[in-house]
């Protein structure tokens, strides 16, 4: 009992140190390490409609503190949940990373910016909770897939946007939503270009997913990461990793490459990696390119968290 009280005290002090601007000591991260996992779930908030938004926690079995990553799922803003990227989440967590995958509000229930508000809240919430799962709350990273990558880009570029900060975190009102780095697979980095591609290909489901999410319609431009850069908005620039399938006809490689170059030209640190022979969701299937993606994400995390 005494050891449990001591552990809880240390974890509580870890968050207080972060809130005060003091970074807790963190062990170096070895992406080749192997850990067992404890997987659990908790509710992290409820939507206006009363729907539970759950967080799935992949906690390495070790002492830590481990690097901490928030996973934002894809699904074209209209589908999927925290389990969508489970194979990737497990692969990252088994190397010694606390991975927390969260549900996001879906567009049929509430359009933009609801899911970005969820992500913003989730970062602040995770900063208060990471230590209780042996994670380091001082340097939160993000992994985002497809539309989750779009949310991740907005989250990272606009961490203090009052619209995105709209949901108060009562237990830590001063916590901020800044993140340290973002790794992404097939992010929708140019929302309007993707919509134009859907129209060209006559993909009714993709078109509908856009019209249900971007309400009013001009938000497809306001929330477009490419256009944010083109407008020279004042943004926060954290290191980005973009992994892109060369055969992706959902998010076109040329569009993705343009975003990467624009981010780089704006002074951002970005790695753009093309995966030959791969489509939009190649990481959903086992294979050499999926293994390569997992190793790439882990190496990217290592470079961020082990940097002096």
Language model features by range: what are they?
Residues 1-17:
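N-terminal secretory signal peptides and thylakoid transit peptides that target proteins
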Residues 28-62:
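N-terminal cap/lid segment of alpha/beta-hydrolase-fold proteins
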Residues 31, 164-165, 169, 193-231:
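Mobile cap/lid helix-loop segments that gate and shape the active-site cleft of serine hydrolases
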Residues 65-74:
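Short beta-strand element of the alpha/beta-hydrolase
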Residues 83-100:
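Short amphipathic alpha-helix adjacent to the substrate-entry channel of hydrolases
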Residues 111-130:
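Alpha/beta-hydrolase active-site loop
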Residues 124, 128-197:
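Primarily recognizes the serine-hydrolase "nucleophile elbow" in alpha/beta-hydrolase
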Residues 242-244:
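Short beta-strand/loop motif that positions the catalytic acidic residue
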């Amino acid at each position: 009992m005494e050891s449990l009280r001591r552990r809880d005290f240390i974890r509580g002090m870890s968050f207080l140190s972060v809130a005060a601007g003091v970074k807790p000591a963190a062990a170096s991260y070895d992406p080749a390490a192997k850990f067992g996992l404890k997987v659990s779930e908790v509710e992290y908030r409820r939507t206006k409609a009363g729907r539970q938004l759950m967080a799935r926690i992949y906690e390495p079995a070790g002492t830590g503190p481990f690097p901490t990553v928030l996973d934002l799922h894809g699904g074209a803003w209209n589908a999927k949940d925290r389990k969508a990227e489970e194979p990737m989440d497990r692969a990252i967590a088994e190397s010694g990373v606390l991975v927390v995958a969260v549900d996001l509000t879906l567009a049929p229930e509430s359009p933009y910016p609801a899911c970005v508000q969820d992500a913003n809240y989730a970062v602040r919430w995770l900063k208060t909770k990471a230590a209780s799962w042996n994670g380091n709350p001082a340097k939160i990273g993000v992994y985002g897939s497809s539309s989750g990558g779009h949310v991740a880009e907005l989250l990272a570029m606009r961490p203090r946007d009052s619209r995105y900060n709209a949901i108060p975190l009562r237990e830590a009102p001063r916590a901020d939503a800044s993140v340290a780095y973002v790794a992404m697979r097939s992010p929708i980095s140019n929302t309007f270009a993707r919509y134009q591609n859907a129209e060209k290909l006559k993909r009714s489901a993709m078109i509908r997913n856009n019209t249900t999410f971007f309400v009013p319609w001009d938000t497809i431009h306001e929330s477009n990461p490419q256009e944010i850069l083109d407008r020279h908005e004042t943004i926060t620039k954290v290191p980005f990793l973009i992994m892109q399938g060369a055969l992706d006809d959902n998010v076109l490689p040329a569009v993705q490459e343009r975003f990467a170059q624009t981010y780089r030209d704006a002074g951002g640190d970005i790695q753009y990696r093309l995966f030959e022979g791969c489509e939009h969701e190649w990481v959903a299937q086992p294979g050499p390119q999926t293994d390569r993606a997992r190793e790439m994400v882990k190496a990217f995390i290592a470079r961020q968290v082990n940097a002096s």
